[in-house]
Structures are given as structure tokens and as C-alpha cells.
């Protein structure tokens, strides 16, 4: 066997392993939050970025082995930004044989008309885009709207709200839309961005640049993203543990009187969540809780339940 064949064989092995991990992550998120149900018609919002391409690919893959029946329709909003490659997504989706709809709305022109030069356009653009996608979901008769946000996006949102908003609020894997008419799901909620990036690179998706509108990146979010990436490099397992913390909230040991009845504590009240250790500090694990090095993931695979019959 030639050296090139050896490399190709290794690359394929790594891609299969990566795809299996992404499928498992998505399958677990779907099961944990009951994201997809029998007969669902899912509107997959496709921007042309790595996240939405990966979401569509994994959902299509799971569709073949899932114990329930559901359908997918990919939707892209062409906002008429200068230089937007209109042919890329239709060609890609037709090649896959995926049902799709390209919605053409000149939101770019509206934003440029309403927002003074030099001011950020993201807020108005987001509101316009959201309204159009909600309308499209109704027109297509879809039961769920799938967005491509991943675990890193969720953590970034948590820290943005903590640092700048004064609240512990992240990005929900599943919730009712703000208009009260649609269920929004995020199937990539358990997926790492670095896994998605590696998968997108290996699959060579036809990526569409995200800066066509000319807007500047969200500086606050970028600072948080850089901070999390730095932590991930310097302290392996910290990101995983922080995300686990979002799934293991202990209201009695926080300060929100809406979540826990502190005023109702009297002599004779039951001990809740271990009670207060008073002067003693809580014992903290030396290693991040629940984290395993990446090379140990084969062992973890044997212990986890493949909820969507990943093969």
C-alpha cells in the first residue's frame, strides 16, 4: 500500500470517528430535550456556514437510522447582500436531493436605509431575519425550526449575560419562539465547535463568507470566545465541566429568591442539597468532573446509550 493510500485510509478512519461522535452528541441532545418527534417536519436554517452545513448533514444521517420518522426542509434567506453567491446553496442541495427553499428578501437594503453609516446593523437585521423565517416556517407547515448553534455558542452566551447582562442565561437547546408560534431546537447543543470545524474541513462544504454585509464582528462575543479557547488549551476539561454545570443547577446554593424559598427556611426545615457547610469549604475535585481525555472516547462510547441507534 502506498503512502498516499495509508494517509487516505487514516483520514477516512478519523472522519468516521468524528462523524460518529457528532452523531452521538446530536442524538443525545435530541433525546434529552425531546427535540424531534414522530412525524415532525423540521425547517433546517441553512446559512452556508460550517455549523448549519454540519447540522443538515448529521440530521440527514440520523434520519436513516432513527427509530422515528421525520422530514427535513432546508431554508436559506437570501438577504441580497452584495456579492452573495446565489448559486452555491441550490447547487449543493439539489446534488444532495434535499428539499429546500430559498427565500429572497432585500433586508440588506432596508437595514442600509434605516441605520446610519458606521452604526451596527446586527440588531435590526436579526429582527427582520427572524420574522421572515417564522413566516416561512408557517408557510412550509413545519413543526420545528432547527438552528445551528453549538455548545461553544451556548457557553459564550452564558458568559455574555453574566459579564454584561447581570443574569445567568444561556441559549436553550429547545424553547418556544418569541412570537409564541414555533418550537426552536438546537441539535448541535452538545457538539464542540472544534469538532464541527474539523468535520466541515474534511467534508469540504462550500462555505459562504459570513461578512458579506460589511458589519463588524461582535467584539464582546469575540472576547468571550477567545477566553474560552484559551481556557480549553490551558485547562483541558474546563469547557466540558462548565457546560455540565449548566445542566446541574443548584438553586438553593445561589441567590435567586424566585428559584428557591430562602425566606421559608426555619428551625426544623429539611436539609437541602447537603445544606450549608458553614466555615468549611466544599471539596472540589482535582480533575474536571465527568471529563475524559479525547483518546479515551472509545471507552466512553461503550458506556453511553446510543439513543438514535447510531451504527
From Swiss-Prot:
Catalyzes the ATP-dependent 2-thiolation of cytidine in position 32 of tRNA, to form 2-thiocytidine (s(2)C32). The sulfur atoms are provided by the cysteine/cysteine desulfurase (IscS) system. One of its GO terms (molecular function) is ATP binding. It is found in: Cytoplasm. Keywords: 4Fe-4S, ATP-binding, Cytoplasm, Iron, Iron-sulfur, Magnesium, Metal-binding, Nucleotide-binding, RNA-binding, Transferase, tRNA processing, tRNA-binding. The gene is ttcA. This is tRNA-cytidine(32) 2-sulfurtransferase. [4Fe-4S] cluster binds at residues 122, 125, 213. It comes from Shigella flexneri. One of its GO terms (cellular component) is cytoplasm.
